[in-house]
Amino acid sequence: MKSARRRSRELATQGLYQWLLSGSPGGEIDAQLRGAQGFDKADHEHLDAVLHGVIRDSEALSAAIAPCLDRPIEQLSPVERAVLLVAAFELKNHLDIPYRVVINEAVELAKTFGGADGYKYVNGVLDKLSAQLREDETQAARKR
């Protein structure tokens, strides 16, 4: 059974995918997500924070992700880009969520919504990004 937090990440990823493709306002996407299957079982507070936070901070998040990529962020598939934005937002703003959990959840999102090997790429990018954004936490984990 999926956790409420996982459902909120799935819905945020779907909403951000739509936002990346259509450029629709966040409020419009939010309204559509409220009618989506699984919304009633999602962590609404986390969904709102992630969806609106990523849209608000998308330039800064993309700038943080860019050095970890092997190509311009615009060349990523919209699914990979949405997943990376969700994870980057959580890494930067939700320090209560361990970085390994953020990476694992992003890998699961990439497996669910992305191409065959997209999850491997997401994992590699987030490994680099977490080392930058959560240097102390990642170094402590690697010393164990």
Swiss-Prot record:
GO molecular function: RNA binding
UniProt keyword list: RNA-binding, Transcription, Transcription antitermination, Transcription regulation
GO BP term, pick one: transcription antitermination
InterPro entries, sorted: NusB-like_sf, NusB_fam, NusB_RsmB_TIM44
Family statement: Belongs to the NusB family.
Functional note: Involved in transcription antitermination. Required for transcription of ribosomal RNA (rRNA) genes. Binds specifically to the boxA antiterminator sequence of the ribosomal RNA (rrn) operons.
Protein name per UniProt: Transcription antitermination protein NusB
Organism: Paraburkholderia xenovorans (strain LB400)
